Amino acid sequence: MSPSTINPESSPLHTYYFSMVEMSIMKLFLDHKIFTLIPTTPGASIPVTTLTTTLNASPSLLTRLTNFLIASGVLSSPQPGHIAHTPKSLQFTDPTSYQALFFAHIFDFFLVPAVKWPGYMAEHGLNEPTSASRTPFGYAAGYPDKTLYEILETMPKRAAQFNATMAASFQPMPVLGMYDFSWIEKLADEERMAIVDVGGGKGQALKEILGAYPGIRPEQCVLFDVDDVIREAVAEAERDDDETWRTVRKIPGSFFSEQPVKGAAVYHIRRVLNDWPDEDCVTILRRIRDAAAPNSRVLISEQILQEEPSLAVAALDLWMLNFGGKRRSEGMFGELAQRTGWKVNGVFRDKESDTGVVELVVA
């Protein structure tokens, strides 16, 4: 039985099928910048034969592809053999636009790995990835034992696309307004480190905290991240001639290895656990627990999964499955804490978003 013999009113099959076809053609048009070749002047069109010459493409193939996009309403055909833009296709005329970047991104980084889910699950069972180096993305890319970032190092073009899309789609996640850091200001006379920003990048969040709480001494704070990132942070501090930021200690290392700063008051970990499977998160939190004092705290700043997430959040959570990451609920953070010698002492939520701070204390 072909798909055309099924009554579309009694089955969602056609909706799924047509979406697959449309997405596949759209990706081709984006890759070959075909949307940019169609005139954007209202009422203007272009002969398909002109496109075939410009693209050195098969006339038969291009006709078949455009036939579907016309039928689906992505393109229009004001006269036989011509195509023109619609409001849908006009969104993709700029290859650097958010729409164009994100479409290609979800195709390459969600759809392609998702197509391989059956094979991945047949090999690993119906289980979440237990390691960032054993993921659906790696399985689909032909690197079943490498992490996303290790794989991207072998794909410069794909890596550039990934980074461009992340930059275009990045929505700032609040650092302040949820948790009251003022108690840390009272530690100014102590010798211990006040804040260790674990996996803190170039220190964007730590800078915000120090700016809002001037009683926290910068010299009592540590930025901890991998070598390359710390080098960039040091260079940035020198370039900006920021004396306050220069006094913050910057220590390179891996959060999977021993935490070099012992007994800090706070180990701040923001937008990190979100990217890793449970077992890797357990390792990260255990390394901190091994370094902690009896009264140390961990502040996990992340987007917190609701018990009944929205469609968009549920989709994002499954997108992260491809790389081994996941969104977590309060209960999930509690389970991680219990496994690593911590306990949840409080959850402080942002009123405008799903962002929150989960405070852990030694169990």
Curated annotation (Swiss-Prot):
Its EC number is 2.1.1.-. It is an enzyme of class 2 (transferase). Keywords: Methyltransferase, S-adenosyl-L-methionine, Transferase. S-adenosyl-L-methionine binds at residues 199-200, 225, 254-255, 270-271. Gene3D superfamilies: Vaccinia Virus protein VP39, Winged helix-like DNA-binding domain superfamily/Winged helix DNA-binding domain. Coiled coil: none annotated. Induction: Expression is positively regulated by the cluster-specific transcription factor pynR. It holds the Pfam family Methyltransf_2. InterPro entries: COMT-like (IPR016461), O_MeTrfase_dom (IPR001077), SAM-dependent_MTases_sf (IPR029063), WH-like_DNA-bd_sf (IPR036388), WH_DNA-bd_sf (IPR036390). Disruption phenotype: Leads to a small accumulation of pyranonigrin J and the formation of a desmethylated product pyranonigrin K. PROSITE patterns: SAM_OMT_II (PS51683). Pathway: Secondary metabolite biosynthesis. One of its GO terms (biological process) is secondary metabolic process. It comes from the Eukaryota. One of its GO terms (molecular function) is O-methyltransferase activity. Methyltransferase; part of the gene cluster that mediates the biosynthesis of pyranonigrins, a family of antioxidative compounds. The first step of pyranonigrins biosynthesis is performed by the hybrid PKS-NRPS synthetase that condenses 6 malonyl-CoA units to an acetyl starter unit, to form a 1,3,5-trioxotetradecane-6,8-dienyl-ACP. The enoyl reductase (ER) domain of pynA is likely to be functional during the first two rounds of polyketide chain extension, to generate the saturated C-C bonds of the alkyl side chain. PynA subsequently forms the amide bond between the acyl chain and L-serine. Belongs to the class I-like SAM-binding methyltransferase superfamily. Cation-independent O-methyltransferase family. This is Methyltransferase pynC. It comes from Aspergillus niger (strain ATCC MYA-4892 / CBS 513.88 / FGSC A1513). The lineage of its organism: Eukaryota, Fungi, Dikarya, Ascomycota, Pezizomycotina. The gene is pynC.
